[in-house]
């Protein structure tokens, strides 16, 4: 299956749906390469960066679900790599 490498940026302005956000990230956990979260108390927000290697439709579905959460926004930035297979070959 062809996959894309992408960075998903998430801004959490409302902590109310953070549990739902974590459920979504868990749902797509098999595609996640890494995740970094930074709280920013001065502005009362959290910034999360998630790196994925997944089919484009899965990335779109994940960012769409995250974007529907109240007070949480997300955007995906795709690497300019050719689509690749997630399975290793000899």
Predicted regions and their residues:
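Long, contiguous binding/interaction regions
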Residues: 1-90
């Amino acid at each position: 299956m062809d996959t894309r490498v992408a960075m998903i940026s998430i801004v959490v302005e409302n902590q109310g749906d953070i549990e739902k956000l974590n459920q979504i990230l868990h749902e797509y956990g098999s595609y996640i390469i890494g995740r970094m979260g930074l709280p920013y108390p001065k502005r009362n927000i959290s910034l999360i960066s998630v790196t994925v290697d997944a089919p484009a439709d899965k990335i779109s579905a994940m960012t769409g679900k995250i974007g529907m959460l109240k007070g949480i926004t997300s955007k995906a930035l795709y690497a300019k790599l050719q689509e690749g297979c997630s399975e290793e070959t000899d």
